[in-house]
Amino acid sequence: MPSAPPRLTTPVLSAAQRERFERDGYLVLEGFVPGVECDALRARAHELVVGFDAETHRSVFTTDDQTRKTDDYFLDSGDKISFFFEEGAFDARGQLRQPKERSINKIGHAQHDLDPVFDRFSRQPALA
C-alpha cells in the first residue's frame, strides 16, 4: 500500500501573511523569485512585445465590462501568445498614443507552453 504524501507541519503562510492577503486580496512574497529570474522574464516579455506587429489587431483588455469588450482575438488566444492593449492606448484616429512597449496591458495566454523562457519558469516545483 503506498504511503500518504507527507503533510506540512507548519503553515506555508504566517498568520500575518494570511491576514494581509484577506485584507488586500494579494500578497507579495519578497525574494520568492530571485531577481535574476524576474529580469529574464521581463527581458523575454520585452522581446516578445518588440517582435509583435501592433498593426495586426487592436484588441484592448480591460476587466471592466469585459463581456462587451471581449473580441474574437481574445477568445481565440488560449493556444497562442497574444497581446492586449491598455484601454486608452489609441487616440481618436486609431494611432497608439505612446510606443507599443508602454501600451500593452496583458500578454496571454500560452506563453508558458510556447516560449522556452516562460516554460522553464512556469514549471518549477516551487510554483506547484
Give, region by region, the residue ranges found by the protein language model.
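Non-heme Fe(II)-dependent double-stranded beta-helix
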Residues: 2-22, 30-128
